[in-house]
């Protein structure tokens, strides 16, 4: 989160704006161009320049200001040991998503990584998720999405798959429940238990 908010503020300051880091948490999750337009009322062209400026700091610096939540590696290893396919479906640009996973030492634990620009004509979350399922050869009834924002929950619903929300991410209090998450986990162990429970049905 820190890498994202600091890089958003860096971009804003280049354009004569400023904001407290806590007020910029809303930029974690949705497509940045859309969020800049929504929050600051800028044109698409201005928003695209803000995103360019964001990446000017985020790629060389911001990616090193975050780390995987404790237990994530072990969860992914357990899923793969059980024969599950794993995928990332993110609104981040494909190359940036790959870079973040490599930096975290997690890339080899995912069969598929799909980001915006990764073969998707429209960057809507549900289309990115659909593309990830296609590349995995998976059907909706055999999938579950684990996400930390309402955009994940909404994207999953449009694809006909359940979403397990996680409390340790970017969502505001009550956001995941209001969006319709199947359940909300407080810990990685709870996510693992929920996935296991789904397998038994």
What do these predicted regions represent?
Residues 123-154:
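Conserved Lys-Pro-Asp/Glu-containing loop-to-beta segment of HAD-superfamily phosphomonoesterases
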Residues 23-25, 52, 107-122:
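A short, structured active-site edge motif that brings together acidic residues
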């Amino acid at each position: 989160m820190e890498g994202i908010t600091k890089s958003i503020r860096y971009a804003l300051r280049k354009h004569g704006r400023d904001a407290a880091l806590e007020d910029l948490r809303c930029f974690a999750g949705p497509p940045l161009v859309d969020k800049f337009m929504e929050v600051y009322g800028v044109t698409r062209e201005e928003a695209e320049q803000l995103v360019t400026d964001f990446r000017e700091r985020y790629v060389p610096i911001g990616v090193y200001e975050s780390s995987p939540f404790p237990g994530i590696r072990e969860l992914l290893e357990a899923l793969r040991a059980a024969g599950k396919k794993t995928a990332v479906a993110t609104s981040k640009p494909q190359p940036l998503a790959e870079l973040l996973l490599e930096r975290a030492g997690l890339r080899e634990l995912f069969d598929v990584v799909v980001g915006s620009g990764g073969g998707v004509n429209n960057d809507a979350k549900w289309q990115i998720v659909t593309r990830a399922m296609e590349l995995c050869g998976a059907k909706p009834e055999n999938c579950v999405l684990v996400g930390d924002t309402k955009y994940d929950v909404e994207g999953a619903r449009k694809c006909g798959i359940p979403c397990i929300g996680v409390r340790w991410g970017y969502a505001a209090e009550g956001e995941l429940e209001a969006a319709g998450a199947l359940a909300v986990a407080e810990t990685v162990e709870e996510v693992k238990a929920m996935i296991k429970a789904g397998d038994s049905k």
